[in-house]
Amino acid sequence: INYVPVMLTFPTELTRSFERKNKESLSNISQSVKLPDQTPEKGEESVQKTFTEEWGGLKDDELTFVYNDEELLLLHRDIWLQMTEEERRSKKSVLDVGCGYGKEAIVLTKIFPEAFVVGADMNLAVIEAGERLVREKNVNPVVASLFHLPFADNGFDHVHCQGVIHHTFSTYEGFKAISRKVDLLKGTLFVWVYAKEDRYMVPGIRGFCVWLYWAVSHSIFRPILSRSPSFIRSFFVHLISILMHPVIMFRGRNKGKWKYANTVHGIRDAFTPMYAHEHGFNEFLGWFEETGFNPVLQRSAHYKEIFGSRLVGVGANGYRKDETIIPSGSLN
């Protein structure tokens, strides 16, 4: 649909509508053509709805969260991946798990210039972006669940997943599912998730506000809003956004580019997903080791040099255990 394969294993209103509109054509192709009929993973229908609303509202904005396009490239290439140019050019196939509206997949084509990049996401807003994305060199969008990706195991030179698996029913199960898509010999796996330590590391009143945000969002907003009808969810999101936007729009590096849509996007991400799990550093790093990777942690000090603020969350780029690891930041 709009150049985007929809490879979900469970039915949605989109696929039902497609079947109704094309019933005669489908029957001419084969009598066995039917809707996907499996049961979605726990919470997936809610996750799909809330993230479709989130990315459909922002669309192709010049900012992705707090980052402009140039900053997004620096973040992924220099802070998180830390690969040499030779390493990056050696990658021929890249899977971006949770591509949002597609901008992250475009960034990955710049980092991996020789690679065929597949941008997979369960949110249906990626379909709206389809025609634009397929015009980009080497970008290939697909709608799919990360638990049922329509690709062979061990098929990608690099799998990239930033801020996604902690929004599933089980971050650990999500990690295992995407790790199976990494090439067994020289494949790499990058993952970033919310860090449990963050809510305890900020001192003073600001630290209390961080702790309060997590407590309120997890105990009140997420359980209620993720299960509410869309119009109720949107009402509260816009109510909070109207109150917060006058404060947020004048903060940060890109305050001149910050729009109301950016505030709404941030509020939706903060309060509407059903799941937003936090994980400790040691727990997270252990997952890499269990699945056959040596993890290289993100560059926190370098992040502060570039962006002037503290890096949150925990990210690591995992190498297969028999590979020699030489992060590019260590080279002269």
For each of these PLM feature ranges, what is it?
Residues 172-186:
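A short glycine-rich, Lys/Arg-flanked "PGG" loop and its adjoining helix->strand segment in the class I
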Residues 103-106, 168-173:
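Short N-terminal helix/helix-N-cap motif within the alpha/beta-hydrolase-1
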Residues 188-224:
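Conserved class I S-adenosyl-L-methionine
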Residues 160:
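A conserved beta-strand element that flanks and buttresses the S-adenosyl-L-methionine
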Residues 1-150, 276-277, 283, 299-331:
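Conserved N-terminal segment of class I S-adenosyl-L-methionine
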